[in-house]
Amino acid sequence: MITVYGIKNCDTVKKALKWLADHNIEHKLHDYRVDGLDLNFLTQAETQFGWDVLVNKRSTTWRNLDEQVKNSLDKTTALSVLAENPTLIKRPIILQDGKALIGFNEKEYQAAFA
């Protein structure tokens, strides 16, 4: 079973979940707001994608983040800022069975789950 990490009311997460369901791929949602977020997951995601890819700079959370925090964000501070602000994480994320996907791109999903 595939675990999709994200937030259930996110449109991009909804697209990914619908795509998985339409292709009969067993999956479950790990909602950051409901199920929490641990440092181990963030560390794995950072290793796969890099901290700068994990940060969703188009999010409302990013726009509302203190300028000093934004300007000082780097590899050493990113994970703690993301842990404190899970809606700042680009989503959805799938890290499972050698698959590492972030965001939703139908072609990438087709290639990963073919």
From Swiss-Prot:
In Swiss-Prot or TrEMBL terms, this protein is called Uncharacterized protein HI_0103
Q: Which PROSITE patterns match?
A: ARSC
Q: Name the CDD domains for this protein.
A: ArsC_Yffb
Annotated Gene3D superfamilies: Glutaredoxin (3.40.30.10)
Give start-end of the signal peptide.
Answer: none
Enumerate the InterPro entries for this protein. Arsenate_reductase-like, Thioredoxin-like_sf, Tscrpt_reg_Spx/MgsR
Q: Which PANTHER family match?
A: ARSENATE REDUCTASE, PROTEIN YFFB
What family is this protein classified in?
A: Belongs to the ArsC family.
Identify which residues the record assigns to the active site: 10
Which SUPFAM superfamilies is this protein grouped with?
A: Thioredoxin-like
